[in-house]
């Protein structure tokens, strides 16, 4: 089950506390967004959320 409605609302809930906005993706992972808002670093795994924002070093 998809934990977010980013395809509908444009917001991804990543993990328990982080929320990515302006998403264009259709699915979300539990700890990563496969889409990143402008200003977030991007990589193959998406953007890793740290605290309440998207981490700048996301590749793991």
From Swiss-Prot:
Keywords: Metal-binding, Metal-thiolate cluster
Signal sequence bounds: none
Keyword Metal-binding: yes
Pfam families: Metallothio
Residue pairs linked by disulfide bridges in the UniProt entry: none
Binding residues annotated for a divalent metal cation 2, in chain numbering: 6, 12, 14, 25
Region annotation Beta: where it falls in the sequence: 1-28
Residues at which a divalent metal cation 7 binds: 49, 54, 58-59
Binding annotation for a divalent metal cation 1: 4, 6, 20, 23
Binding site for a divalent metal cation 6: 36, 40, 43, 59
Region (Alpha) location: 29-60
InterPro entries in alphabetical order: Metalthion_dom_sf, Metalthion_dom_sf_vert, Metalthion_vert, Metalthion_vert_metal_BS
Binding-site residues, a divalent metal cation 5: 33, 35-36, 49
Matching SUPFAM superfamilies: Metallothionein (SSF57868)
GO MF term list: metal ion binding
Protein origin, superkingdom: Eukaryota
Residues that bind a divalent metal cation 3: 14, 18, 23, 28
Role played: Metallothioneins have a high content of cysteine residues that bind various heavy metals.
Family: Belongs to the metallothionein superfamily. Type 1 family.
Protein name: Metallothionein B
Organism of origin: Carassius cuvieri (Japanese white crucian carp)
């Amino acid at each position: 089950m998809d934990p977010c409605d980013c395809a509908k609302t444009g917001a991804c809930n990543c993990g328990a506390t982080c929320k990515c906005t302006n998403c264009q993706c259709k699915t979300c992972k539990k700890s990563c967004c496969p889409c990143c808002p402008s200003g977030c670093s991007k990589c193959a795994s998406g953007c890793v959320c740290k605290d309440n924002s998207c981490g700048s070093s996301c590749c793991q």
